[in-house]
A protein has these predicted regions:
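Transmembrane beta-strands of outer-membrane beta-barrel proteins
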Residues: 94-98, 170-176, 229-231, 290-294, ...
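Transmembrane beta-strands of outer-membrane beta-barrel pores
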Residues: 100-104, 176-182, 235-239, 296-302, ...
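Short loop/turn motifs that connect adjacent beta-strands in outer-membrane beta-barrel proteins
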Residues: 88-93, 162-171, 225-226, 285-289, ...
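Extracellular loop and loop/strand-boundary signature of outer-membrane beta-barrel proteins
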Residues: 140-143, 198-205, 259-266, 275, ...
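Periplasmic N-terminal accessory/gating domains of Gram-negative outer-membrane beta-barrel systems
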Residues: 1-21, 25-27, 36-70, 77
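Flexible, surface-exposed loop regions and adjacent strand-edge segments
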Residues: 112-117, 186-197, 245-258, 307-316
Length: 364
């Protein structure tokens, strides 16, 4: 979906930025819908869902609307991007996909992974129950991995049936996928005061692993070629875990050795998005129809056991800092979202090639 959207005039993608820009306007000025319903981001830090999840085996079409319309979302200054999920075409199919990749420069290099995240990317979120004991489930030291292979698996398929004497078509379509990829970066972190004084100047290495799963299901039922009902389900699980080791100057370190020290930051963001949609279309007459539907979305964002350790340079090597310089932090976010829409549509002409109509309805 992202590749298709960026080919539209006025839409661009910047390296290192998660979402697209429309006429120079970023995430907060755009909106994303899924089958016409507003859909939240899988990442609580963003307003719009990442288009990276939507490959050609998942979407039927994607549209970009840069002009205001009465049925659209109001808080949009750039564009509304509507993703239409895939439905079964034909009587049935089955597809299986497998891909892999590696970086020959780093494939056998030591890669640091934090403790507490399993192979599927689900993190251990258990907090210490006893504040006097602080029995953490996760180890403080990261582990080392010596073989990094990017990999992706997918499967999709569906089947069509005919129900009753009218042979009304009932179709099912399901797709699921898993992706794991690794990133290794050299980083430089510098901070200054408003007067230009440098109080932080550190360099280091960051090891990042991205694990995600996506599942999408669609059920369609047509009744007498006049009424249509469909249910869509989508689940996105995304885990980003990283370990960063940095050395250099930081004002929190002891000034006896020019504020030199070492920082290790271990962080995992474990996010889950679940989308449920029910859509109906009722042909009341040849020229009048009723569209009605509802969606229920669930977002869960976890940042379990973020670990930050700082040690300062000293005469005997490195020592722990005093005060609140060490950190183990837990955060959770749970949000439910309900959207409904209904509208009466009157076709001005009873002609297949004539699409002019009048619509009166509600979306919210």
């Amino acid at each position: 979906a992202e590749g298709a959207v960026t080919k539209v005039a006025g839409v661009s993608k910047q390296d290192g930025v998660k979402n697209v820009f429309v006429r120079g306007l970023g995430d907060r000025y755009n909106a994303t819908t899924f089958n016409g319903f507003a859909v939240p981001s899988e990442d609580p830090e963003y307003k719009n869902i990442s288009l990276d999840f939507f490959g050609t085996d998942i979407i039927q079409s994607v549209g970009v609307n840069k002009a205001f319309n009465a049925g659209g979302i109001s808080d949009v200054g750039g564009a509304t991007i509507d993703i239409v999920s895939k439905e079964l075409i034909g009587s049935g199919n089955l597809n299986i996909g497998l891909s892999g990749g590696l970086n020959t420069q780093t494939v056998t290099a030591d890669f640091l992974k934090q403790d507490g995240v399993n192979l599927l990317g689900f993190a251990t979120t258990t907090e210490p129950a006893d504040e006097n004991n602080w029995g953490f489930k996760n180890k403080l030291d990261p582990s080392k991995q010596s073989l990094q292979i990017n990999r992706s698996y997918s499967i999709s398929g569906g089947k069509r049936f005919h129900i009753g004497k009218d042979r009304n078509p009932l179709s099912f379509f399901l797709t699921a996928g898993h992706t794991t990829d690794y990133q290794f970066t050299d980083e430089t972190i510098r901070n200054t005061t408003t007067s230009g004084t440098i109080y932080k100047d550190m360099t280091g290495k960051k090891y990042t692993e991205n694990i995600s799963q996506l599942a999408l299901a669609n059920v369609d039922y047509d009744m007498q070629n006049r009424h249509h009902m469909s249910y869509n389900f989508m689940m996105i699980h995304a885990n980003v875990q990283s370990v960063g080791d940095y050395t250099g100057k930081n004002s929190i370190f002891s000034d006896d050795y020019d504020n030199q020290g070492f920082t290790r930051r271990q962080q995992a963001n474990d996010n889950l998005l679940i989308v449920n949609q029910l859509m109906t279309n009722w042909g009341l007459t040849k020229t009048l129809s009723l569209d009605a539907g509802a969606s229920y979305n669930i977002v869960k964002g976890n940042e379990p056991d973020r670990r930050i350790n700082n040690i300062t340079k000293a005469e005997e090597g490195y020592t722990l800092l005093r005060g609140n310089s060490q950190q183990r932090y837990f955060s959770t976010l749970d949000e439910d979202d309900i959207n409904v829409k209904a509208g009466l549509i009157y076709r001005l002409k009873d002609n297949v090639e004539e699409i002019s109509n009048i619509r009166l309805g509600y979306t919210g």
